[in-house]
Amino acid sequence: MANKFTRQQISEFREQFSVYDKNGDGHITTEEFGAVMRSLGLNLTQAELQEEINDSDLDGDGTINFTEFLCAMAKDTYSEKDLKKDFRLFDIDKNGFISAAEMRYVRTILRWKQTDEEIDEIIKAADVDGDGQINYREFARLMMAKNQGHDTKYDTTGGTLERDLAAGVAKNIIAAPMTDFIKNLFEALFS
């Protein structure tokens, strides 16, 4: 189901779009998308980059325009493959955990406006085992809880990852670009 965006959200999405649209021509190419991913330490192959672009390229021109970007932002379901990609995006040092410092780094690169305190709140909300960082299971549980309409600020422990993923598959999950995941994570925790 597509979301109806507020003017503020559209403005924020336009700013996010400009992070990727380096030359300002109104289209995100695989090269531009790849440059942002590499700046975050994620070295996707050309085929993976093209697949990410194709997931949102509604008119088939090989790029993502702002309207297509908004459509991608409106998607609210994800696949396990996308969960893993997004987890890798945040896990800068590739140690299997997302720290507050890594989340702040991604925030800086993608020009998000969350404060350090809000980042700490995200970590605390997702950190089920209390070790001060987010492992993959905690990340997936947080995203699946958000996906199923739970209040992710307080409900991150309900169910198992396997059950949550099975529920998602049963709903015919539609693959969404990783920027969609990350943006929705921040919006879900602070809306």
Curated annotation (Swiss-Prot):
Binding residues for Ca(2+) 2: D57, D59, D61, T63, E68
Cited Pfam families: EF-hand_7
Sites where the protein binds Ca(2+) 4: D127, D129, D131, Q133, E138
Family: Belongs to the calmodulin family.
Species of the source: Arabidopsis thaliana (Mouse-ear cress)
Keyword Calcium in annotation: yes
A Gene Ontology BP annotation from the UniProt entry: cellular response to hypoxia
Claim: rRNA-binding is one of the keywords in the record: no
GO cellular component: cytoplasm; cytosol
Protein name, UniProt field: Calmodulin-like protein 10
Gene that encodes the chain: CML10
Tissue specificity field: Specifically expressed in leaves.
Domain named EF-hand: residues: 8-43, 44-73, 78-113, 114-149
Task of the protein: Potential calcium sensor.
